[in-house]
């Protein structure tokens, strides 16, 4: 659907070249929700602007549906942009227009007949749950309602792609969840490809199928959501994941390790999370199991569990218990320098 091939964007600033995006190669499949996460200045917003040619790449090519877009004429670009909807952190609504008028705006630009505009806008108002707000102005709406208007407006011309630029960053947690659920509905019912950028890993966790991590203009890690969360390879990705799955060792656990305690990290996936492996080894081997920390989250409808346990008993029995655990779950001994 969307392909970035060795794409770079360089700006000149104060006589120096600044690489906002550097040699990025990515592929976004049709109908998926693809997240790009990074800290401020990572280059993710620049990458988004390259998709609809608000910025042109310094090097490399970008293709949509196998059509290279960097050499399109002005007329062709105008047609391309009708296929791409966009929502923003700051909503970007016209304060002088009603909710109906905001949603209708791109349809009027496209010279759609009035009766069709009315039908389409009413359909979208119902879709985003704002049927009773058609004649309201943006100042009369909450942040979540404003973003719903933004989503409806982005969908007005029936695009194939929806770009979300920090779409939930200005919202409270409850409203964020509501907007993410609405975006899932958009993806599911309209089969839209959604390209989303954020600095919040919990947003990626809730909605994305795949994710790329950017740092200093480069993609440093990319893959399926479950793989990136459960096996983060880079330090930056690990820090993002820890904002959702806190695997830092508490001081009390570190003290136990330093005093000779045998601490192990157990990770469970899918059906493994429902297996009573700890009670089994406690009953069948002469060991005591002390659970020090644990959590379970859901990633794309698959459970992922993380436990820290201390095993106490004779070394021979502990080794037998460990042998059994290795057959059931992923197991790693935690060392004193771990954090």
From Swiss-Prot:
Keyword Plastid among record annotations: no
The GO terms this record gives for MF are: ABC-type D-methionine transporter activity; ATP binding; ATP hydrolysis activity
> How is this protein situated with respect to the membrane?
Peripheral membrane protein
- Quote the SMART domains the UniProt record gives: AAA, NIL
Give the top-rank taxon of the lineage listed in the UniProt record for this protein: Bacteria
Q: Which residues form the signal peptide?
A: none
Instruction: Write down the top EC class of this protein.
Output: translocase
Q: Could you tell me what reaction this enzyme catalyses?
A: L-methionine(out) + ATP + H2O = L-methionine(in) + ADP + phosphate + H(+); D-methionine(out) + ATP + H2O = D-methionine(in) + ADP + phosphate + H(+)
Q: Which residues form the ABC transporter domain?
A: 2-241
Tell me its EC number(s), please. 7.4.2.11
Indicate which residues the UniProt annotation says bind ATP: 38-45
What InterPro entries does the entry give?
AAA+_ATPase, ABC_transporter-like_ATP-bd, ABC_transporter-like_CS, ACT-like_dom_sf, MetN_ABC, MetN_ABC_transporter-like, NIL_domain, P-loop_NTPase
Its GO CC terms are:
plasma membrane
Q: What are the subcellular locations of this protein?
A: Cell membrane
Q: Which UniProt keywords apply?
A: Amino-acid transport, ATP-binding, Cell membrane, Membrane, Nucleotide-binding, Translocase, Transport
**PANTHER family, alphabetized:** AMINO ACID IMPORT ATP-BINDING PROTEIN, METHIONINE IMPORT ATP-BINDING PROTEIN METN
Q: What does the record note on quaternary structure?
A: The complex is composed of two ATP-binding proteins (MetN), two transmembrane proteins (MetI) and a solute-binding protein (MetQ).
Known role:
Part of the ABC transporter complex MetNIQ involved in methionine import. Responsible for energy coupling to the transport system.
Which family does the similarity line name?
A: Belongs to the ABC transporter superfamily. Methionine importer (TC 3.A.1.24) family.
Instruction: Write the protein's name.
Output: Methionine import ATP-binding protein MetN 2
Write down the species. Bacillus cereus (strain ZK / E33L)
């Amino acid at each position: 659907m969307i392909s970035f091939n060795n794409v770079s964007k360089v700006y000149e600033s104060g006589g120096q070249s600044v690489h906002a995006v550097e040699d990025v190669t990515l592929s976004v499949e049709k109908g998926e929700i693809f997240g790009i996460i990074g800290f401020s200045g990572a280059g993710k917003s620049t990458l988004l602007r390259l998709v609809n040619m608000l910025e042109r790449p310094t090097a490399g090519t970008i293709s949509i549906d196998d059509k290279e877009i960097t050499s399109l004429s002005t007329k062709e670009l105008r047609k391309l942009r009708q296929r791409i909807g966009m929502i923003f952190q700051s909503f970007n609504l016209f304060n002088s227009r009603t909710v109906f008028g905001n949603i209708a705006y791109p349809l009027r630009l496209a010279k759609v007949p009035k009766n069709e505009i009315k039908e389409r806008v009413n359909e979208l108002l119902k879709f985003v749950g704002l049927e009773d707000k058609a004649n309201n102005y943006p100042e009369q709406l909450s942040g979540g309602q404003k973003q719903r208007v933004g989503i409806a407006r982005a969908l007005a011309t029936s695009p194939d792609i929806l770009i979300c630029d920090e779409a939930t960053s200005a919202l409270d947690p409850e409203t964020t969840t509501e907007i993410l659920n609405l975006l899932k509905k958009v993806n599911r019912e309209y089969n839209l490809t959604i390209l989303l950028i954020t600095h919040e890993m919990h947003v990626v966790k809730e909605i994305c199928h795949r994710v790329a991590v950017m740092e200093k203009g480069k993609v440093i890690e990319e893959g399926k959501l479950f793989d990136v969360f459960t096996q983060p390879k880079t330090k930056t990705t690990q820090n993002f994941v820890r904002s959702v799955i806190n695997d830092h060792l508490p001081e009390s656990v570190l003290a136990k390790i330093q005093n000779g305690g045998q601490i192990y990290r157990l990770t469970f996936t899918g059906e493994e999370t429902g297996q009573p492996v700890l009670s089994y080894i406690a009953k069948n081997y002469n060991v005591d199991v002390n659970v020090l920390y644990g959590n379970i989250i859901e990633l794309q409808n698959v459970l992922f569990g993380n436990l820290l346990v201390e095993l106490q008993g004779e070394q021979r029995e502990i080794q037998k218990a460990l042998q059994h655990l290795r057959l059931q779950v992923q197991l790693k001994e935690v060392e004193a320098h771990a954090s």
